[in-house]
């Protein structure tokens, strides 16, 4: 099985995470650099193997911190500016939660998307295995 290794020490924002995905997983392809497009990449066939792959996330503990509530607040503020007005109350409520240090973080969003493509996930046919590795001490 093909394995891709991303390094949490190389990024501290969602945009930089997307850059790392490009560098490691699909260096010759253009993609949307958003959560929906990342989900599409995990299906396979978009520069990634149809039969699935392992995603190894080095320094995942660092990513958990860097992609925590401050980055989540920043992302939700951006989303609030761009979203359709019918979604604004929902996004504003998420933003209030994040400002209070509650709810899912950007790190959680990414993990949920990846795990949805693995064993027991709604899109398990993608056969993506996630391995989180802490920083080596």
How should these model regions be labeled?
Residues 1-137:
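Positively charged, polar, low-complexity stretches
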């Amino acid at each position: 099985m093909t394995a891709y290794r991303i390094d949490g020490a190389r990024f501290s924002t969602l945009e930089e995470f997307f850059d790392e995905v490009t560098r490691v997983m699909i260096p010759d392809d253009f993609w949307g650099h958003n959560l929906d497009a990342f989900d599409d990449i995990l299906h396979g066939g978009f520069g990634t193997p149809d039969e699935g792959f392992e995603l190894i996330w080095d320094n995942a503990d660092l990513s958990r911190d860097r992609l925590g509530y401050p980055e989540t607040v920043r992302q939700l503020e951006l989303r609030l500016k761009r979203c359709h007005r019918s979604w604004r109350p929902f996004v504003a409520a998420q933003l209030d939660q994040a400002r209070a240090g509650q709810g899912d973080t950007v790190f959680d969003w990414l993990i949920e998307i990846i795990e949805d493509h693995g064993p027991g996930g709604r899109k398990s046919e993608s056969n993506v295995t996630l391995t989180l590795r802490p920083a080596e001490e």
